[in-house]
Amino acid sequence: MSHAPGEGRPVSSLFPARCNEEVASQNATTMATLNEIELSEIEELSLNFKETPRQDHSMTPVELCYFDDFATTLVVDAVLNFSTHKMCKKRRYLYGDEQRVARELMERFRKDQDWTPAIYGFLNMRSVRSFIEKLAFNKQLEFRDHIIRFLNVFHHDSGYTIQECTRYSLEGNQGAKLVATRAWYRGDKIQRLSGVVCLLSTQDEDTILQPEGSDFSVMYSNRKRCSTLWLGPGAYINHDCRPTCEFVSHGSTAHIRVLRDMVAGDEITCFYGSEFFGPKNMDCECLTCEKTKRGKFSTSDEEENDEPSALSEKRIKYGLRSRSRV
């Protein structure tokens, strides 16, 4: 669905009074120190967009890392109330009271499903304006679109949402999971759930993939013979040895296809690989392994491991996701 500018109305008329007060306060604070982005550009970014952004993009791996960190901070963390996976763990993304502002914007969006106030409110935050003023307009569009991808996680029509997950000890028993909010059937494509992919050169891997365990997801493509950075909402999909869904990559994005019928409350999972969690996934803590007494739940030293059919792309993870309270 596309949204066109609103017949010459000032964008401020589209927002609740409290949102206007927050934006006005932030603008007053930053005017002396920032080269202000023209209001017309903010209006363009906030009013003329698609609820499901185009699949292709021109983000570099570094840009995708920063865009993803910012978007998850603004949207996901504001709802879950803890910091989810970040590529740049030491970077601070929000200033002062902006965490509260983000929480209020997300509370309002989840209630009224109005895109423009949420987008406009985020883009007018001091920290966001400081970040995007350095970007060319086409990159501002891509940053805005990445925020929209995460807003879809909380849209009533998405058919899924995100919840806290306490299953995995390697995450300190505080992570996230995606769950269905409606029935899905084998072969369905989850339209509002996607991953964003960037090819990684050897130099990119040396620059981005930190040995101390930066949080990121990587897929190795046998077809392309290179590693690809995988972020976006799809990065929150957990592994299961009997998955409900699968990754389907195409170009610079990947969509999610349903493998088994699901009802509301079922977790959206994919298969990462037969040795992702050690030999024969001996350290796997997925629900299927718990039910079948395999992986981390096995009581024997040796076990047979019935593997799902081989994937053309093997998902490899170089670091563990850490979580800290906001």
Curated annotation (Swiss-Prot):
Record organism: Caenorhabditis briggsae
UniProt-listed Gene3D superfamilies: Histone-lysine N-methyltransferase, SET domain
Similarity field: Belongs to the class V-like SAM-binding methyltransferase superfamily. Histone-lysine methyltransferase family. Suvar4-20 subfamily.
Catalytic activity: N(6)-methyl-L-lysyl(20)-[histone H4] + S-adenosyl-L-methionine = N(6),N(6)-dimethyl-L-lysyl(20)-[histone H4] + S-adenosyl-L-homocysteine + H(+); N(6),N(6)-dimethyl-L-lysyl(20)-[histone H4] + S-adenosyl-L-methionine = N(6),N(6),N(6)-trimethyl-L-lysyl(20)-[histone H4] + S-adenosyl-L-homocysteine + H(+)
Disulfide-linked positions: none
Single GO BP term: methylation
Region span, Disordered: 294-313
GO molecular function ontology, one term from the record: histone H4K20me methyltransferase activity
InterPro entries documented for this protein: Hist-Lys_N-MTase_N, SET_dom, SET_dom_sf, Suv4-20/Set9, Suv4-20_animal
SUPFAM superfamilies, alphabetized: SET domain (SSF82199)
Subcellular location: Nucleus; Chromosome
Domain SET: 163-273
GO cellular component terms attached to this protein's record: chromosome; nucleus
Main location: nucleus
Keywords: Chromatin regulator, Chromosome, Methyltransferase, Nucleus, Repressor, S-adenosyl-L-methionine, Transcription, Transcription regulation, Transferase
Record's protein name: Histone-lysine N-methyltransferase Suv4-20
CDD domains: SET_Suv4-20-like (cd10524)
Main function: Histone methyltransferase that specifically di- and trimethylates 'Lys-20' of histone H4 (H4K20me2/me3). H4 'Lys-20' trimethylation represents a specific tag for epigenetic transcriptional repression. Contributes to dosage compensation of X chromosome-relative to autosome-linked gene expression, possibly by converting H4K20me1 to H4K20m2/me3 on autosomes. Involved in the regulation of growth and body fat metabolism downstream of the TOR complex 2 pathway.
EC number of this enzyme: 2.1.1.362
PROSITE patterns: SAM_MT43_SUVAR420_2, SET
